[in-house]
Amino acid sequence: MSTATIQDEDIKFQRENWEMIRSHVSPIISNLTMDNLQESHRDLFQVNILIGRNIICKNVVDFTLNKQNGRLIPALSALIALLNSDIPDIGETLAKELMLMFVQQFNRKDYVSCGNILQCLSILFLYDVIHEIVILQILLLLLEKNSLRLVIAVMKICGWKLALVSKKTHDMIWEKLRYILQTQELSSTLRESLETLFEIRQKDYKSGSQGLFILDPTSYTVHTHSYIVSDEDEANKELGNFEKCENFNELTMAFDTLRQKLLINNTSDTNEGSNSQLQIYDMTSTNDVEFKKKIYLVLKSSLSGDEAAHKLLKLKIANNLKKSVVDIIIKSSLQESTFSKFYSILSERMITFHRSWQTAYNETFEQNYTQDIEDYETDQLRILGKFWGHLISYEFLPMDCLKIIKLTEEESCPQGRIFIKFLFQELVNELGLDELQLRLNSSKLDGMFPLEGDAEHIRYSINFFTAIGLGLLTEDMRSRLTIIQEVEDAEEEEKKLREEEELEKLRKKARESQPTQGPKIHESRLFLQKDTRENSRSRSPFTVETRKRARSRTPPRGSRNHRNRSRTPPARRQRHR
């Protein structure tokens, strides 16, 4: 058989295979819904989609351009993310083709098709299939052309993720939108849509990713693709058409290996509950260091919190080691100069994956506050407070975990009080005072917000929260303290009255006993005075003689009539006269 004949037979065989793949793939994608997503993903692997990857890309683009499929775009995006995990070429091709198709439809002013494509690209950005540079190119183009409706649609879906990975550009876009809202004359509908978007941002995009399919991190590998549009690039019009495959046999062997791997994974997932075995780790000092080093390298090599969570969960860490992993995550976050939401998003994914991770985070929080708090510096306390405040505000950790804190001068240290300050400031920033007050009322945090017991404890707590600018949280304590003080004042007044009554009784007893003792005392005094007078009168002769002898020896004076009383000689006196 000649070479030309062999080549013709080969092309014929490949064409028949291509037709079979196309007839199998097209109905699966055209009938795709969120309910049959996983089943559709499995069905695609019944044919060699390594050879037919362009067929899948063509069907995805056509599905997106169909104006009636707007509500099914989330399911399509999830399917692309699953396929990209196994075959990254599909994600790379679709990132380019969807971007070029958007530019083409935008120039044609087909805004419905543009909306579908943007929805798909935005969700793929959330799944880390495409890089943020793709979304930023689109947003800058839309702002330049003043296509505000499409900008609003994109920001509603992926604005929260854009704020995490490219904060400066995110803020620049918002400043541009604020300027447009304040300076330009807009229709009432468009103005209302913009105001709604600003309200969503104020709530930190809490409803941004609702309704999306949650990918299993243990079986999902992240491959992120970027593409920069140039003026010369155009969408591939031949996408999905038959082309001879030069490496047909190699792709066939590679697909068999891939399908076998997927079958093994599915079988292990199915039998995991019945055939699971306890994983044993040798945690000697050497292996402990290696284990921590491995976790640390996973964190530092990840571009996003979602990617880090996927890598960590893929390790299938035993329950007794999860607390160590959480401790490494927190220590890594404290090495940053400021608080990074990378670690909070990572923690969100870990906690929601299994309740054993929530237990590990609860135990680590208790250890941070009760044992390690005095070892942290002020900047680290700020990061630590924001980290735990974020998890508590979004209810990944319950408010009851704060029950271990008792806010008194004796049972709290300065570092602990600084930590509480930053934690509550983060709670207020995330929830607002009103929502925080409602949550505190539903949780009995007697250690920080006491309503019973010692008045000094209540007073200290009031003074603390007032000093950090959260005095509104202390209204119940203030009312309770007023009641306690009134009760204490009444008890003190009653005590004084009892003391005065006792003192009055003692005085009364003293007055009653005074008349019986008074005359005896008086008579005894008279007796002593009389005895003293008699003793002074009845002196003995010996005493009189003694007194006479004791008189002065000065010569006796003469009579008062004697003229010469002076001792001056008479003659001298006469001369003087």
UniProtKB/Swiss-Prot annotation:
Domain of life (superkingdom): Eukaryota
SUPFAM superfamilies: ARM repeat
Protein name, as recorded: Pre-mRNA-splicing factor CWC22
UniProt family annotation: Belongs to the CWC22 family.
Pfam families: MA3
Main localisation: cytoplasm
A molecular function (GO) term: RNA binding
One BP term from GO: mRNA splicing, via spliceosome
Keyword field contains Cell membrane: no
InterPro entries membership: ARM-type_fold, CWC22_splicing_factor, Initiation_fac_eIF4g_MI, MIF4G-like_typ-3
Statement: the UniProt record of this protein carries the keyword Cytoplasm: yes
GO (cellular component) term, any one: U2-type spliceosomal complex
Renumbered residue ranges of the record's region Disordered: 505-577
Domain spans labelled MIF4G: 22-204
More about this protein: Present with 3260 molecules/cell in log phase SD medium.
